[in-house]
Amino acid sequence: MKTIDELLTEGVAGRRVFVRADLNVPLDGTTITDDGRIRAVLPTVAKLAEAGARVVVASHLGRPKGAPDPAFSLAPAAARLGELLGADVAFATDTVGDSARAAVEGLTDGQVAVLENLRFNAGETSKDDAERGAFADRLGELADVYVGDGFGAVHRKHASVYDLPARLPHYAGYLIATEVGVLKKLTTDVKRPYAVVLGGAKVSDKLGVIDHLLEKADRILIGGGMVFTFLAAQGHEVGASLLQEDQIPVVKEYIERAKERGVEFVLPVDVLVAGEFPDMKTKAPAHPATVAADAIPAGQMGLDIGPESRKLYASKLTDTATVFWNGPMGVFEHPDYAEGTRAVAQALIDSPAFTVVGGGDSAAAVRILGFDENAFGHISTGGGASLEYLEGKTLPGLAALEG
């Protein structure tokens, strides 16, 4: 995989460099609530601009249905990128139309333009190779060189991620090079003991990575909504908690395999419960109760790991050499259910281990709960991408850059 440093050595002055970034930031109306992904691509964009490239930044945001939708405009992200760069950034109101062409043609050396949301075009995400290829052709008309730096999208077989690199000289940006380097540490030469903390709502989303980690990890800590399927698999009542009954046989099999391989599965010993899901708009006090994890009352739902579990999980992370964390321990966006996630984040900071936060909600939680991002070994920008990499899957965006 050739990197941006090789491109810079070749020289980029006056060349149109297409940067496939991941500016898929959370918005409250037009206000960006977490600009982490924009800041993550800044080194690549800034270095190219400094070297005299005419930088064309493209990204998706959200899941519009292949047509323009103002709610998913990249205009706020483009404005924030300009603020972070300390420079004017042109914004095209379409992706491959008149506005995009004018924005790119208007660039002088060292200037940056951002195209409108790639997913406003059906060809970006099409499963039809010809339709996707035709859209990639139109994107290719706007550039001389391709730099892939949207790690959060490399697991998608989309036109800008997979098809476009085949049409242009292609290089990995700083972010993708860093992400791949870190994830290789977790797969090829991991320092032991290796602990993995997995949370999030659905166990079905994590089955692939658990299956793979049973061959790699020494200890797996489970939290979040997915924990209740594990508790049910052990024969416990889980009340009104989130439960994927159809996954219980697979979970039972994984628990048995873990025993056979000497992998320690750690489940909570207590949980915070309430009769209803909290009000996420008002964040009104929810007054949860703490109950034993194996004695959740009927009609009550578990919404975070409890105080004893927080201590247990912290103790399981103190004697590790490597920790990978993906997924919150509870409904961390509500203050009454944030302490489990906070405890895990603090345990990672306190641990002497090399710590990796696996993107998605975990990365958001680190920022929302006010932790210093530099206190962790690495915070990934790709939740789904990092999980699929750890599963050993071929990621289309990386395969395209290696081709």
Predicted regions and their residues:
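Active-site loop-to-helix "anion-binding N-cap" substructures in soluble metabolic enzymes
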Residues: 1-403
